Amino acid sequence: MNFYTDDISNGYNWKGLERSIARMMAHLGWNDINVIGGAGDKGGDVLATRIDGGQIKSWVVQSKAVTGNRYIGPQALNEAIAALSFYETNVAVVATNGEFTGTARHRQEQLLTSGYTLKLWNGIFLRNLIERMPEDHAGLRQLRKYQKDIVEKVVASFDAGDKRAFYIVATGLGKTVIAATIAKQLWAKGCRKILVLCHATDLALQLEQGFWPQITKEVPTSVFFDGLPPRNTEGISFGLYQSLYGYLPGIDPEQFDVVIVDEAHHALAHGFRTCLEHLKPKFLVGMTATPWRGDGQSLTTIFGYPIAKVSLVDGMAMGYLSRVDYRILCDNVDWDNMQSISTQNLSIRDLNRRLFLPQRDEAVIRELKNAMQEISSPKIAIFSPSIEHSNRFADMLSASGIPCAALSKVEKAERRRRLLAFASGNYQAVCAVDVMNEGIDIPDVNILVFLRATHSRRIFVQQLGRGLRLSEGKEKVIVLDFVSDIRRMAEMIEMNNEGKTKGAENEIVYLQEGFVSFSDARVESFVNVWLEDVADLSDSDDEVKLKFPEGF
């Protein structure tokens, strides 16, 4: 038994064929796997990269499912070459569960003669290769101590007859690796129908791919969205609560042995909660990187109290996240105006408007170029305040000699093309408003630029986490925060103080020097005095009235 199941090999599950090809490639060592098949895919179904001769080569795969005695002709090869051109990849592949016609083979020879690298993978090739593959994935990760501890606690809770478990692990510290290992161990205990729920299609696909390295090839996986229900077969199903919601009346509450909820802070939404109240699994697992909700509701009502919490600061202290050089660039504070506004009873919104001068893009680019001098092979992610600014700033960066792609409000295929080009090194920077918050994983990012003042701690931590993942050759991540919100300053000072005083459990490493620096020391003093009276300033609403500390 393996993930290349009969419905896939017989051509009745074309989406399953796409993902099986992607899983096979990931299992054998391809990287940056992205399943892209669907409307507007420009002829590509799977994107990936692979090191070849010391160079990163990008691949695009056109997947063709056939039933009965049908064959794949040369048109599929032409579509694959069109995809190669659109996504600007080095290699194109046409893969099928069936066989190719003689004219398709002849067309391949013509294209090879013309300089294209085009490979044909037929059904026999796929089946034989998957059967001969090792049971374990090439990217199987050995668990770190804190990950192993969480897995052991969750599995022990299951063995003790408990019905639920909940853990909080910050972005970049492997919460999906933990969940996949839990699923693997519960599978071995007879839990053969596992449901993984989330709130977004891209996240469901990323979760499925995130599970692959930790599970053996015998465990089938599938996804459901676009209004389709989960499959009632053995395996791990990944999908959206929105799709599940419409099918609840026809789903046996005990259909699934285990239900795992990712980004659990979404679970209190009405539809999500209704799904979880309907389902009666043997065990419910909740996980999140960012437990805060804007409406103040608590996740403990569904998942219970967390059995473990590992914060960003914990991860940095243990050395499992990149070393951070966080620079709060507050040269835009209007100190000249401070005296005139210090006697007024201002809201946070009004204070931000009066305290911070507009930041010029040219000054931001100068500061960014200075930071790039300190990093070998700079890879930059920029968070803009608006789509209009994102597009304009990407153009300005490119014109200044830093190739940059805007990611917000572009067609999905084009965004994937740009992300692949970024992963392959064709762009040095990407610029977005919010599409990098969830479901995007770019470990090589070593410079983050914040031009946007988010009022959500959860979103801010997700954005910060984009640059914290470790990767080969990455010495540190420089964060340039062109702050324009007093709450952001408070957030970072609190995190910095935590880093100085709190080591992670069972660890003796501390961030005694902190990791945050201010371009103007007066700002840190200003916010620290304020924090004495406003302990929760970082979570305060726009309309909260503030009183200036004396002396400012």
Predicted segments with their positions:
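Long, largely alpha-helical accessory region at the distal end of helicase-like NTP-driven motors
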Residues: 363-374, 379, 491-552
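A short beta-strand element within the Helicase C-terminal
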Residues: 256-257, 429-454, 459-464, 477-481
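Conserved helix-turn-beta segment of the N-terminal RecA-like "Helicase ATP-binding" lobe
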Residues: 202-225
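Mixed-charge (Asp/Glu-Lys/Arg
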Residues: 1-169, 177, 515-518, 526-546
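Post-DEXD/H (motif II) to motif III coupling segment of the RecA-like Helicase ATP-binding lobe
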Residues: 265-327
